[in-house]
Amino acid sequence: MSGRSFMLATRVPMSRTGFEAWLDTPPPSLDVIENPAAMWTGWAAAGDAADWDLTAFADSPHIVAAMRADQRKTPRELLTDRVKTGGCVARHRDEALELYLYDYHADFYRTRTELLMLAGAGRYADVGAHPVLFWGGNVYADLPIAGDPPLSVLVVSRAGAHFVDRYPIDALVESLRPIEAAFLARYEGDGSAEPDLTDAVDPDLRP
């Protein structure tokens, strides 16, 4: 599982009722994030443009249209598509939304939709500030090794969301280990059998 890959992981405490409501609520607009231009600030891609306007695809309007269409899909639609192709944990477990999303040989533009999707989860979250870890590059799909900076950290809450330029990453990584374990378990075996979705995917999202 090496190659240019991008991953998101989070654990956002919320009730089952909140989780189900979030699944059927389209992602909010970019205004939900207080400082979208600061997506890379302080981390491995510091200095790069956030490019929420998708100017990199100015000559490919069909790509921009497809990305904008994804931003109008509900989390249920986005995650159901994910489950079909593998590479994710998406579940409500122990009174929390747990996600681990993996894009192999991809670019990080798709992640903008997923960050908006998770920013929208704050509306249904328990009181508090809840981090979303975004990392990737020419790395494995495992959580970052100690000392390796992520690409970004988004903090979501009932008040909205914002990017931060520092965060106790080692502690965050350790808190995400159980979700990582469920993700890695999907790739056990020789690949001849269909992956067991029981632990990794919520019943509401299974085929």
PLM regions and their residue ranges:
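Short, extreme N-terminal segment that most often corresponds to the first beta-strand
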Residues: 1-45, 207
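Short N-terminal segments
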Residues: 40-52, 57
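Charged interaction segments
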Residues: 52-207
